[in-house]
Each structure stands twice: as C-alpha cells, then as structure tokens.
Amino acid sequence: MEILGERMLLRPLNLSDSERLVSLINASVNELREFMPWMRENVTRKEEDEYLLRAVQEMNLNQAFHFAMVLKESKEVIGVIATHPIDWLNESVSIGYWIATAFSGKGYTTESVVLLLEGLFMELKLHRVAVSTTTDNVASNRIIEKIGFRFEGVQKLAGKVAPSRWKDLNTFALLDTEYKSMRKNLFEKFLGGKYPKVKLA
C-alpha cells in the first residue's frame, strides 16, 4: 500500500532504505534518544538491516505496516511511520513515528499521520487506532492533538527510554466513526483540500 498526499508519500520500507535511515537516525540521535525506546546510541547498518528484514516480513504477512515518509517532490526519505502488530480480531492498532531533526517542525509528520489514518480506516477497515507519546514530548503531543485524537489518559511510567529510565505516556485514540466525521476537515486543514490517493499493492 502506498498513500500519496499533498507534500508526502508513504511507501513500504525496503532493504535499500537502510543506508539512508542510518544516516538520518544518527544525525538526529540527540533528539530521538529522549523519546524513542529503541534509540540508545548511534545505530549500525547491521541493526538497521535487521529491523528492515523484520519490517518487510511483517508487511508481507499483514501483521504490521512500516512506511518510509518520503517528500513527494524530491523523493527524499525523511523518517518512518508504522503500526505496531495489528489486532485483527478487535480491528485495532497503535502507531508510532519519527522524523529526522532537519525536517521537523514543517508539518510533514502531521500530514503523514493523516495519510496513515486514511489507509488504516478506509482501506484496512480498522475500528480503532491509538497512539502513545511521552508526556514531555511536546511536539508529538501537539501533532496528535491537532489531528483530533481523543485523550484517554496517562500510563504511569509505561515508556522505557533508557535501560533504567521510564516516562509517563499520554494515550490517545480515534474510532473509525470519529475519523470519518472529521475526515474532510483534516484534508482541508493538512492536505490543501486534496483527498489522499491510496494505491494497493
């Protein structure tokens, strides 16, 4: 599945993305380390290759979806947005994302989340999409709130951000009915009024 928006394209990650992702992550290590549980020190090519192999396998089995966040015009990969394993029985999933520091603050992540929601709700027909972010991750919380996710509560010390360091997590969610009621407004607000184009593999 590929999803095309106004400025962004979401496309499945593949093994050839490894070198680019290593470069982006390591250039953003100081910012990512504070909020990403998998980010300790600089990542190696071997570690990224292993992640991409798992990501491709999960996508092939429809267990989870891992997308490169790509600038539509330049074709540059600038981050990753993905689901955690999908609970197909309950038609629900949680999502996560990161963007390289050099591209943050420009609305790219917000657009990417809206595009992913379109794919999850309208194509995969999921019932519920959730996202958790550390309470002190101001930028991520702002993105989720702008889009219109419903705040569900705080999970006490549920996010591990270092071997012996934990943070509280804000939990947000959207139901399919909630998304459909705000869908047109989201496109007007974040996609220049254009509907996303979803291409199924």
Q: Where are these predicted regions, by residue range?
A:
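Acyl-donor (CoA/ACP) binding surface of acyl/acetyltransferases
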Residues: 1-20, 24-31, 66, 70-201
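Residue-level detector of secondary-structure transition/capping positions
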Residues: 26-29, 40, 56
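Conserved GNAT-fold acetyl-CoA-binding loop/helix
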Residues: 33-53
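A short helix-loop-beta-strand connector motif used in the catalytic cores of GNAT acetyltransferases and
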Residues: 53-68
